[in-house]
Amino acid sequence: MLINIQVGDVLEVAANVLISTANPWLNLSGGVNGAILSAVGPTIQEELHTYLHCQGISAVPVGTVVQSEAGNLPFECILHAVAIDPFYDSSVELVRETIVAGLDLAINAGAKTISTPTLATGYGPMSIADFGTAVAPLANEPKFDEISLTIVVRSEEHRSELFEAISAARVSHRR
């Protein structure tokens, strides 16, 4: 998998699929989710709450990825990835598992290009470097060879931090 790092607004980075951060209640309440709600209006929020209602649950388990329409955003769909628990805790392992679930779902949807913010680093406890550590080993997974992942960060400082973490994780993973 080719990993790109870009500074900007994740909602403006065109890709086949956006893997967006989500909370267990699938509420579009802040951060990237709040931006989705502002950009698209209530339709995606209604779709996510309908999903919960149809499943007979009020929240999804940690690690779940739920697909929705993308509205007027430059994606074929949005994958809402729950990489935090109900107390907004997370780990490198949980983020990696959640990203893998999202990438698998994206591939099954026919995606070749995927964009994502750094999951669990806003309201969650993870650092940008932790996210890099979680994602780096996936670059060498054969099942992801045909896709590219663009990780979108908000500053040049975050881009540098993420690049260094991914580079360091790749070196230590090869040992």
Question: Where are the regions a protein language model picked out?
Answer:
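Phosphate/ribose-phosphate-bearing ligand recognition and processing surfaces
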Residues: 84-175
